[in-house]
């Protein structure tokens, strides 16, 4: 097993996750089996209870793990399915060690950070690195580990010390350290500054780790003189200093790394069994990046949510829309609309903001209402849904978005004016959306319904069923407590709003479609978590196709085209995917 540790310096948020994912993509393109681990030094057990404004989106894995959004990058770039134990937190490590101490596993010894915490970290990494993540059930050959935060943070000291010890345990030929650092370029002088990187590497070396590769993040390509200066002061060869400057899309990052010869250096330093790295995967990646930059047609989607002030809150939603737009050769124009801005209270307090929000909504080719919690902003979402339904604007509702779509239809089309969710009004006379908990024993706790669940299609006449390739069932990831009340489903009989997907027991309503509408779909699950750059999520793809007027053409041609996995030579997906590039789209 080979281990590649990615650390960061100067500031956080400079792209360690994307760089780690890109390195994994390059190695996978060389025919190697790659897994990934993200270390978050916070004391929380997982990301499940975070405020969206604190850490952005909570990414959900197949096994129900609620993790950092960087694991979403790993899954999307590498086309793998990770587990909750691929996300290590300080809280998990301490809980693990304390539980062992309570059981008496340490035989009365004094339990300390060194060696007990550091040993637990190393043991966790070694065990999880062996777990297959690509569906082939073969052990990974390389584990890419991202250490969150920056070198010098007090929260991460135990992890740095653990890897200082681990480099000797794994042996030099199996351990590789990549340090990502910022090279700022002040606008006043325009000169690229190396001092922050020098100090960062000095701090890293002072803690016992020496970088094998320094990745410089900068706004523009770094000059050779800057590279040589970093090389001299940081005790590495010039070819061990590479630059990842700001690019038009993140799909360029693996190509930038590959162009600068990292594969050859990995091969020599780690003794990797690489014969030819010019694989079909890297060619596809380059073609996708080139196509992204050539896009001319624009599709505008309005995202109506309550966490729009921080874009990371909807990171996977944005990626899923981007994947779908790219698949049909359109550039995505995603317009974030705070749902409160659509409400009458905003009209009274700030008329300009109110009218700007409604203008965005009116200009949108499609409308998306994503998941969320709490009553704040729900009135604005209901108004956006009503606009989409009555004006025949393509609409996709995710989780809460689906629940609100059902409530809006019941109030305005079934004359059930009191229809509501018990989340917002516990004593509502018409509890259309109710708490349907699923007990989750263990650390995830609570009553959240989490992870991969099967949805069975109940009708052949479903747009979404066709988009998934006419399969009898699908498996998607969930994260919710509330669902449509199955006891009130009979109210919708012989109406346009049809429940076309249910869970395996037929008790939970998973998919709803409005038959009299070009594309009005709600799903209880979160399909964005399964979207991949070369395998877009069908519900999102349908929204983009409908918004560009190509849905019917796509559905007609799906039956004529062969199905294939658009990413690699093997796939364990529960649905096939048409070759979108062959579709005759306008």
Curated annotation (Swiss-Prot):
Q: What does the record give as the active site?
A: 399 (for gatase activity), 526 (for gatase activity), 528 (for gatase activity)
Give the protein family: Belongs to the CTP synthase family.
Enzyme class, first EC level, given as a word: ligase
Q: Does the keyword Zinc apply?
A: no
Which pathway or pathways does this protein act in? Pyrimidine metabolism; CTP biosynthesis via de novo pathway; CTP from UDP: step 2/2
Which residues are reported to carry the modification Phosphoserine?
Answer: 568, 571, 574
Q: Output the SUPFAM superfamilies linked to this UniProt entry.
A: Class I glutamine amidotransferase-like (SSF52317), P-loop containing nucleoside triphosphate hydrolases (SSF52540)
Q: Which reaction does it catalyse?
A: UTP + L-glutamine + ATP + H2O = CTP + L-glutamate + ADP + phosphate + 2 H(+)
A cellular component term from Gene Ontology for this protein is: mitochondrion
Q: What is this protein called?
A: CTP synthase 2
Q: Which residues form the Glutamine amidotransferase type-1 domain?
A: 300-554
InterPro entries referenced in this protein's UniProt entry, alphabetically: Class_I_gatase-like, CTP_synthase, CTP_synthase_N, GATASE, GATase1_CTP_Synthase, P-loop_NTPase
Q: Which GO terms describe its biological process?
A: 'de novo' CTP biosynthetic process
Q: Name one GO molecular function term.
A: identical protein binding
Q: What is its EC number?
A: 6.3.4.2
Organism, by scientific name, is Mus musculus (Mouse)
Alphabetic keyword roster: ATP-binding, Glutamine amidotransferase, Ligase, Nucleotide-binding, Phosphoprotein, Pyrimidine biosynthesis
Stated role: Catalyzes the ATP-dependent amination of UTP to CTP with either L-glutamine or ammonia as the source of nitrogen. Constitutes the rate-limiting enzyme in the synthesis of cytosine nucleotides.
Q: Entry's Pfam families?
A: CTP_synth_N, GATase
> What domain of life does the native source organism fall in?
Eukaryota
